[in-house]
Amino acid sequence: MPFTLGQRWISDTESELGLGTVVAIDVRMVTLLFPATGENRLYARNDSPITRVMFNPGDTITHHEGWQLKVEEVSEENGLITYIGTRLDTEETGVSMREVLLDSKLTFSKPQDRLFAGQIDRMDRFALRFRARKYQSEQFRLPWSGLRGIRASLIPHQLHIAYEVGQRHAPRVLLADEVGLGKTIEAGMIIHQQLLSGRAERILIVVPESLQHQWLVEMLRRFNLRFSLFDDSRYSEALLDSTNPFETEQMVICSLDFVRRNKQRLEQLADASWDLLVVDEAHHLAWSEEAPSREYQVIEQLAEHIPGVLLLTATPEQLGQQSHFARLRLLDPDRFHDYEEFINEQQKYRPIADAVTLLLGGERLTDDKLNLLGELINEQDIEPLLKAANSQTEDSEAARQELVTMLMDRHGTSRILFRNTRNGVKGFPHRVLHQIKLPLPTQYQTAIKVSGIMGAKKSLEARAKDMLYPEQIYQEFEGENATWWNFDPRVEWLLNYLIANRNEKVLVICAQAATALQLEQVLREREAIRAAVFHEGLSLIERDRAAAYFASEEDGAQVLLCSEIGSEGRNFQFACQLVMFDLPFNPDLLEQRIGRLDRIGQNREIQIMVPYLENTAQAVLVRWYHEGLDAFEHTCPTGRTIYDSGYQELITYLATPSEQEGLDEFIHTCRQQHEGLKLQLEQGRDRLLEMHSNGGEHGQELAEIIADQDNDVNLVSFALNLFDIVGINQEDRSDNLIVLTPSDHMLVPDFPGLPQDGCTVTFDREQALSREDAQFVSWEHPIIRNGLDLILSGDTGSCAVSLLKNKALPVGTLLAELVYVVEAQAPKHLQLTRFLPPTPVRMLMDKNGTNLAAQVEFESFNRQLNAVNRHTSSKLVNAVQQEVHAMLQQAEALVEEQARLLIEAAKHEADDKLSAELARLEALKAVNPNIRDDEIETLEHNRKMVLENLNQAGWRLDAIRLVVVTHQ
């Protein structure tokens, strides 16, 4: 093409320079000035990597002064172009703009503009973009979004609760599962769903101080959620950046004590516009009508300001009715305002729970029971259902299930309370206790005697705690150089036990970090036993490494030595051997120790080894835990109650273990108390609430669906393709692990979700669960989600040129592969993507205007194509520009009809689903006062907004690939 001064061109290789102007021409060279950057470039007149910029009618162009022109006509004179059209700011028609006046900062965002401007991308990027569109659209439509990406086993009751609650607007619920059933995971899944769906963006978690790091680790390791931990120093730091420090982060964890101590902090927290509040250990918030505790008032104030609230607490039976009422009052103060009224209401629900037990028992119902069911359900036309339920026909079971569902909807607190018990959940292992009685060394006997004399002024509690750990008493007197491990028979026993069980992973827990460190040294030096140490002095990364070393099957540690605090929140269900080198002071800590292995998903019996020294406080405590509470071999929901009531007697026996008088009677009394309380708990079981919380078949179905999706080969191939194109280094390791590290040639210098020092990932859920250092990659993992956003929000792969070698077609045959996107714009919380995600519509146009996409599938077509270099591509495009314009016009008419059908289908689906949801809630409100008015109002408003936004839906061209037939 001949050059003329003033013409506008763009560089094919340096598009960031913007629009260039021809400023000098000689026989062989042409000079372009790029005003946007002030740089000059010299090019050969023939075959140089630059493309002439020419716009067409219908395009919108920008003047260098900033105003825009909608092009209606294009004229050319002496090689220079003038555009004529309507000025958009003044609506003046017939306005001319010479090409020399075009804005030099011009960027081409439309795929066809980029194609004609020579900004042509690689063929593999086009394919990646189409796949990204296709997979993203499929993922948006799945209703269990937020549940699949968790790094946890697929436990039906957890999935059911998370799905039920996570789908609600501003959920306000009480999670009261028994210990070991995974309340933290349930809360994390609810948070994850609320964040992914856009229902929540700002999350506040308030926990006891000792659990802050556990929550921080759990949220990051299991859900890839990066929370910020606010303590005094972080608060002071943030105060420099903002008048309200809590507005500097979207997701915050802080301790209850941190908030309670300072009135200003509480006010700032309440004003920080959170969407969801999560409170752990909520049963410690003391309340009475006359004098609620300061802690309770703090959470009450936050709950008044924050729309969504999750309270994690002990089971209602453990709490007692008044304490249980106090938690419900935090969730819905209007509904639960009077304790007496609450008690009366609860008593009315007893017959409902009994009726469910009856229906589930499968026994024939008496006339009295049938009348009771009729009264409880109080619906018209209930008679045929009752008759079917009581018949011997095959319809009987279905009728009973329907009646149970109707009762469940009417159950007082079932919508805001979820409680699972171990009795109602299958999958827990047996626990077997092995007591190893060992002689008390003379060194310890002497140290204990001296300690008794010197510590006479200590409190009874302090002496009791001292007596549990004789090695510490000995070390206190002998100083730093005391080598208690040389004579302590527990050490010798541990060495022999580990040698005898070389093939078993063994978890050893002791009270103090110092003990764990000393034991590691002994195991290493005396028997070369590989051990990892886990204590509170380690950073999170060091703990992860220690846990991964223990988990590794190849060259991993045989033993993990844990301190009490260091083991909080970590689970090692791949091991089944637990050694308690000493014993904790209260039953909650004992259950926490066993809970490291006794989790759902543990598939072997747990062997609990307790080596203890005779005639010591350890011997007393072993007996009390085992004979008094049965706390080793079964979970002990009564433990805390009995511990509190018998505390004084217990610490007396621990402080003076040589005086055993009355111990047998004390243990016997505790056992009777335990059995009595246990019976009360069992009788008080609310079968209806358990069914509602457990989810039954629904939970099982969710687990199976997600397990099937775990094996998605599309994810693996897409992810590896994405990593290649983005420029992330991949190194295969054994055990289905891949190490990802940033490279120097990435599409973006800092890929979101990929740490600077890289990370280890796996696509295998089981592998991720057994390897603490491996991240579980799913469609919901930040690396994949950010990768999809990176590709789709930019121009990557939006235009390409390929060659098709096919002798059945004439040389030079032109095909245009077009990818349109049908989409609607709306606030994220409306979740429009459930009904109309950005949906790709692929077309393969020939020059006659025929769409061949239905006959030619994308992947098989893509495999037949060959790449073309950018320079040749640009020349090809220039040669066929008119034909491409014609093809685009023909495609526009065809895509309009397809888009209309998609939008209409989305509107029908949205209307049907949201109307049904609304009708169900309104019907329930008539029989169950726990349906909040604001929930119904929000749903009604959202339905209206969703339909309005779907009416505004449109479509656009997202990517274009020109395919030219060749025979070579």
From Swiss-Prot:
<keyword id="KW-0804">Transcription</keyword>
<dbReference type="InterPro" id="IPR038718">
    <property type="entry name" value="SNF2-like_sf"/>
</dbReference>
<comment type="subunit">
    <text>Interacts with the RNAP. Has a higher affinity for the core RNAP than for the holoenzyme. Its ATPase activity is stimulated by binding to RNAP.</text>
</comment>
<dbReference type="Pfam" id="PF12137">
    <property type="entry name" value="RapA_C"/>
</dbReference>
<comment type="function">
    <text>Transcription regulator that activates transcription by stimulating RNA polymerase (RNAP) recycling in case of stress conditions such as supercoiled DNA or high salt concentrations. Probably acts by releasing the RNAP, when it is trapped or immobilized on tightly supercoiled DNA. Does not activate transcription on linear DNA. Probably not involved in DNA repair.</text>
</comment>
<keyword id="KW-0805">Transcription regulation</keyword>
<dbReference type="GO" id="GO:0003677">
    <property type="term" value="F:DNA binding"/>
</dbReference>
<feature type="domain" description="Helicase ATP-binding">
    <location>
        <begin position="164"/>
        <end position="334"/>
    </location>
</feature>
<dbReference type="InterPro" id="IPR040765">
    <property type="entry name" value="Tudor_1_RapA"/>
</dbReference>
<keyword id="KW-0378">Hydrolase</keyword>
<dbReference type="InterPro" id="IPR014001">
    <property type="entry name" value="Helicase_ATP-bd"/>
</dbReference>
<dbReference type="GO" id="GO:0005524">
    <property type="term" value="F:ATP binding"/>
</dbReference>
<keyword id="KW-0547">Nucleotide-binding</keyword>
<feature type="domain" description="Helicase C-terminal">
    <location>
        <begin position="490"/>
        <end position="664"/>
    </location>
</feature>
<dbReference type="Pfam" id="PF00271">
    <property type="entry name" value="Helicase_C"/>
</dbReference>
<dbReference type="InterPro" id="IPR049730">
    <property type="entry name" value="SNF2/RAD54-like_C"/>
</dbReference>
<feature type="short sequence motif" description="DEAH box">
    <location>
        <begin position="280"/>
        <end position="283"/>
    </location>
</feature>
<comment type="similarity">
    <text>Belongs to the SNF2/RAD54 helicase family. RapA subfamily.</text>
</comment>
<dbReference type="GO" id="GO:0006355">
    <property type="term" value="P:regulation of DNA-templated transcription"/>
</dbReference>
<keyword id="KW-0238">DNA-binding</keyword>
<dbReference type="Pfam" id="PF18339">
    <property type="entry name" value="Tudor_1_RapA"/>
</dbReference>
<dbReference type="InterPro" id="IPR022737">
    <property type="entry name" value="RapA_C"/>
</dbReference>
<dbReference type="InterPro" id="IPR023949">
    <property type="entry name" value="Helicase_RapA"/>
</dbReference>
<dbReference type="GO" id="GO:0016817">
    <property type="term" value="F:hydrolase activity, acting on acid anhydrides"/>
</dbReference>
<dbReference type="Pfam" id="PF00176">
    <property type="entry name" value="SNF2-rel_dom"/>
</dbReference>
<dbReference type="InterPro" id="IPR001650">
    <property type="entry name" value="Helicase_C-like"/>
</dbReference>
<dbReference type="InterPro" id="IPR027417">
    <property type="entry name" value="P-loop_NTPase"/>
</dbReference>
<dbReference type="InterPro" id="IPR040766">
    <property type="entry name" value="Tudor_2_RapA"/>
</dbReference>
<keyword id="KW-0347">Helicase</keyword>
<dbReference type="GO" id="GO:0004386">
    <property type="term" value="F:helicase activity"/>
</dbReference>
<keyword id="KW-0067">ATP-binding</keyword>
<protein>
    <recommendedName>
        <fullName>RNA polymerase-associated protein RapA</fullName>
        <ecNumber>3.6.4.-</ecNumber>
    </recommendedName>
</protein>
<dbReference type="InterPro" id="IPR000330">
    <property type="entry name" value="SNF2_N"/>
</dbReference>
<feature type="binding site">
    <location>
        <begin position="177"/>
        <end position="184"/>
    </location>
    <ligand>
        <name>ATP</name>
    </ligand>
</feature>
<keyword id="KW-0010">Activator</keyword>
<dbReference type="Pfam" id="PF18337">
    <property type="entry name" value="Tudor_RapA"/>
</dbReference>
